[in-house]
Amino acid sequence: MRVTRDMIDPELRAAGVAFGLLFRPSEWFFRFARRVTARAAGSSVAGLDCDERRIPSLDPDVDVRVRIYRSKTRPSESVPGVVFLHGGGYALGTPEQNGPLYETLIGLRSCVVVAPDYRKSLDAPYPAAVNDCYATLRWLKDNAAELGVRDDQLIVMGQSAGGGLAAAVTLMARDRGEVRVAFQLPLYPMIDDRNATDSARDNDAPVWSEKHNRLGWRLYLGGLAADEVPKYAAPARETDYAHLPATATFVGDLDPFRDETIQYVENLRAAGVDVEFRLFERCYHGFDGIRPDSKVGREANAFVAEQFAAAVDSRFAPQADRPKG
């Protein structure tokens, strides 16, 4: 899908072009960008209490740095727990980059956000990241009482590669039977390594193009052959979507991930999963974060806020080792 300037929402054009000029699809630039984004590690959010722990990954002798965000005013009752997985093409980024969003979520409905600094593909390809992220979910469930979290309201959320990890983590949770997830928000998720859809092929949109995507997947999958890629690496390869948690997601119609997101939504619905979905016209990848002040950016962020609040109000999944009620 070739993307021309006039196809892009006027409010998004300049920022998208500028971002695209800076964020180049090369391994050298990914490594440079990773060093830059890593400087945010340890930064706090002014309106929130921020704590940091190191927890064990699924992999032996590996610890994961996790950031824990909560309201400065501690609620008297337990609150939902949110595992938030940041984006960055599986190659870069830190949990600190989403501070304003954590503040928004906690302001909407009191909750505890646990965000892991999962291992990046530049250092450790699949399954490092998903093992770190699933371990974070399991740790949140096992330590819910200490953290003041309701273990029957665990939500998994992420953007882009973080959305892909969210989808993978909920698959693992269903298959392993160790944690029950009440709701997931895998936003414009990176879930299909094959680059075979109409929206992915030849996509030259700003921010994240086919070239970025192929590089991101090559780094993440390491030496895996095409016929060896498992569903926990690329959740679009799953064939059984039954018994996954209720879901909300959105994607822009110029995003390489458009078609894989739509197919994911259709597969979930066909399996009887409740899904809320929005397709935003004339929007490239990550437009909601690049131009949150635009009309369409406000609409996308309002959709997420609405779906998150509704989930907290109505979605529950009691753990298998806990009594109901």
Predicted regions located by residue number:
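A glycine/proline-hinged amphipathic helix-loop "lid/cap" segment
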Residues: 1-71, 313-325
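Short beta-strand element of the alpha/beta-hydrolase
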Residues: 78-87
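Gly/Ser-rich "nucleophile elbow"/oxyanion-hole loop immediately N-terminal to the catalytic nucleophile
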Residues: 141-156, 176
